[in-house]
Curated annotation (Swiss-Prot):
Catalyzes the decarboxylation of orotidine 5'-monophosphate (OMP) to uridine 5'-monophosphate (UMP). This is Orotidine 5'-phosphate decarboxylase. The active site is at 63 (proton donor). Its EC number is 4.1.1.23. One of its GO terms (biological process) is 'de novo' UMP biosynthetic process. InterPro entries: Aldolase_TIM, OMPdecase, OMPdecase_AS, OMPdecase_bac, OMPdeCOase_dom, RibuloseP-bd_barrel. It comes from Streptococcus pneumoniae (strain Hungary19A-6). The keyword Lyase applies. GO terms for cellular component: cytosol.
């Protein structure tokens, strides 16, 4: 099922900055928030407990990639934090992804990163030594993710349709790199607007700087949310 709330990427360096940012929103508004490496390493597990205590949903974006037993043990800890979604690198392999699923359990969604949206095809071929097209690599990883029993993948919006065709229509496609028209793309190589992401079939979208660095973050969030959901029945 699609998530009507854009996921806000809390790419902040400290707990205090997060508190200041969230204070801009009405206390009763339930948000979907992404905690990435920078914030998690700065604030620790307490940041997840804090956000959950405020009634928000949390996507813990740590992209685990290690031997299966280590990932399984780490996922057991993350399940105790009450995260709503977390992820691994599909490149870790099917056995690692199966171990992650076992460790996390079924209470939270588990997705895999195929290729980072900052990766171009030329970079993939040169540095990863993968001599296929970028799309072929993404589809391969998506199929392996489905085989491992995960809920979906992180992918660019341009790849959503082929991934769902290669797996199944209910396979989650979470799309970062979402930018409203006219906003700078930053370090993302493959970007799309919220409306385009909806039309192409994305289930979740992640938006960072267009909200967090906006002059009015609350207004920016609601404008993006409105664009994302404008054609929903």
């Amino acid at each position: 099922m699609r998530e009507h709330r854009p996921i806000i990427a809390l790419d902040f360096p400290s707990f205090e900055v997060v508190k200041e940012f969230l204070a801009l929103f009405p206390a009763e508004e339930s948000l979907y928030l992404k905690v990435g490496m920078e914030l998690y390493y700065a604030a620790g597990p307490e940041i997840v407990s804090y956000l959950k205590g405020l009634g928000h949903s949390v996507f813990l974006d740590l992209k685990l990639h290690d031997i299966p037993n280590t990932v399984k043990s780490a996922m057991k800890i993350l399940s105790q934090l009450g995260v709503d979604m977390t992820n691994v690198h599909a490149a870790g392999g099917v056995e690692m992804m199966k171990a992650a699923r076992e460790g996390l359990g079924s209470q939270a969604k588990l997705i895999a990163v195929t290729q980072l949206t900052s990766t171009s095809e030329a970079q993939m071929q040169e540095f990863q030594n993968i001599q296929t097209s970028l799309q072929e690599s993404v589809i391969h990883y998506a199929k392996k993710t489905a085989e491992a029993g995960l809920d979906g993948v992180v992918c660019s919006a341009q790849e959503v349709q082929v991934i769902k065709q290669a797996t199944n229509p209910d396979f989650i496609c979470l799309t970062p790199g979402i930018r409203p028209a006219g906003v700078a793309v930053g370090d993302q190589k493959r970007v799309m607007t919220p409306a385009d992401a909806y039309q192409i079939g994305s289930d979740y979208i992640v938006v960072g700087r267009p909200i967090t660095q906006a002059e009015d973050p609350v207004a920016a969030y609601h404008a993006i949310k409105d664009e994302w959901t404008q054609d929903w029945n």
